[in-house]
Amino acid sequence: MDGTTTTLPLAGIRVIDAATVIAAPFCATLLGEFGADVLKVEHPIGGDALRRFGTPTARGDTLTWLSESRNKRSVTLNLQHPEGARVFKELIAHSDVLCENFRPGTLEKWGLGWDVLSKINPRLIMLRVTGYGQTGPYRDRPGFARIAHAVGGIAYLAGMPKGTPVTPGSTTLADYMTGLYGCIGVLLALRHREQTGRGQYIDAALYESVFRCSDELVPAYGMYRKVRERHGSHYNEFACPHGHFQTKDGKWVAISCATDKLFARLANAMGRPELASSSVYGDQKVRLAHASDVNEIVRDWCSSLTRAEVLERCYATATPAAPLNDIADFFGDRHVHARRNLVAIDAEDLGETLIMPNVVPKLSETPGSIRSLGPKLGEHTEEVLKEILGMCDEQINDLRSKRVI
């Protein structure tokens, strides 16, 4: 196994993933799905903490690890040991991208900072992910996704009005968002390198990824000092109805009428076309001014029907509506299967088939692929050291005796 394939757009690109958990490693995972050879560099004792996050497997790791660390080769290496740092530098010399998420100054303390690595490999692209970035007064503070949600403002907006702020969907949302932004940064840096021959480093902060997805929060506050509050299951600043409604069978649907035309469709779906007349609620401004009344009408209608019945009538009139899916709903959705959003991969050492999210986005000519599940700790150490650095068994055994690998 050489970790790459010539039919994918990033074939020939080698990535060192020396990060842990999700954010920076997710960037490496995305690159690996499209052909990059990803070397997962881990500490010999325990490896990446993600191996212990989530549902345990018989192999001693977790389902999270198997899914999120796909298409990677595991190489154990103690970067704090001088010999480990030396081997790491040799790998850097033969690589294109480094993904890391150590606290600022940690790699520098080990003699592996950007100033050192960029001299070894001037073409290197280095993604540095932290909670607050490499600069600024908060740079040394520890940061995780939940902290980023708080600092970036998204947690403040999640929850019922005047109630306790809640987790905005996923506790790891900021990690995935930052991994995506980091991946964009790496691809841009690769393009720049094509033009100039020079690498660069990318400074990605978790809270900034969250903050960037804040629509008009910034200009609204900058111009009018307007602070958006929690709206619960209905967000009626720009559109009404625009929220979640419970159905007769205890399930939920989302309905969004961003225009008057869409509200007219909903009114027809409810069998009450008169609601969309100009003298009632046909104008968005009127609906917004009477949002509680409009929402009550829609709420009463939804509660009189099952979810399937509500959706059937909405779909028949082209009203934007959808079920609030739990994971079981998603597995049973015919559109999900038609789009192949789920993929089954044989986990041979577990004797089972693992179902996981498929690769996105879908490229027409060079689609990504899942070629392997998250590796065992150190599974490819010897393979990589021999293949890339040309080490012999004696050299590898020496590193092992020193607990470098």
From Swiss-Prot:
Signal peptide stretch: none
GO biological process, one term: carbon fixation by 3-hydroxypropionate cycle
InterPro entries from the UniProt entry: CoA-transferase_III, CoA-Trfase_fam_III, CoA-Trfase_III_dom3_sf, CoA-Trfase_III_dom_1_sf
Lineage: Bacteria, Bacillati, Chloroflexota, Chloroflexia, Chloroflexales
Residues annotated as the enzyme's active site: D175
Record field: catalytic activity: succinyl-CoA + (S)-malate = (S)-malyl-CoA + succinate; (3S)-citramalate + succinyl-CoA = (3S)-citramalyl-CoA + succinate
UniProtKB keywords: Carbon dioxide fixation, Transferase
Pfam families linked: CoA_transf_3
Membership in a protein family: Belongs to the CoA-transferase III family.
Name listed for the protein in its UniProt record: Succinyl-CoA--L-malate CoA-transferase beta subunit
Enzyme class: transferase
Reported induction: Under autotrophic growth conditions.
Influence of pH: Optimum pH is 6.5.
Quaternary context: Forms a large complex composed of six heterodimers (alpha, beta).
Role summary: Involved in the 3-hydroxypropionate cycle used for autotrophic carbon dioxide fixation. Catalyzes the transfer of CoA moiety from succinyl-CoA to L-malate to yield L-malyl-CoA. It is highly specific for succinyl-CoA as the CoA donor, however it can accept L-citramalate instead of L-malate as the CoA acceptor.
Temperature and activity: Optimum temperature is 55 degrees Celsius.
Domain of life where this protein originates: Bacteria
Disulfide bonds: none
Stored SUPFAM superfamilies: CoA-transferase family III (CaiB/BaiF)
PANTHER family, alphabetized: L-CARNITINE COA-TRANSFERASE (PTHR48228:SF6), SUCCINYL-COA--D-CITRAMALATE COA-TRANSFERASE (PTHR48228)
EC number annotated for this UniProt entry: 2.8.3.22
Biological source species: Chloroflexus aurantiacus
MF annotations from Gene Ontology: CoA-transferase activity; succinate-citramalate CoA-transferase activity
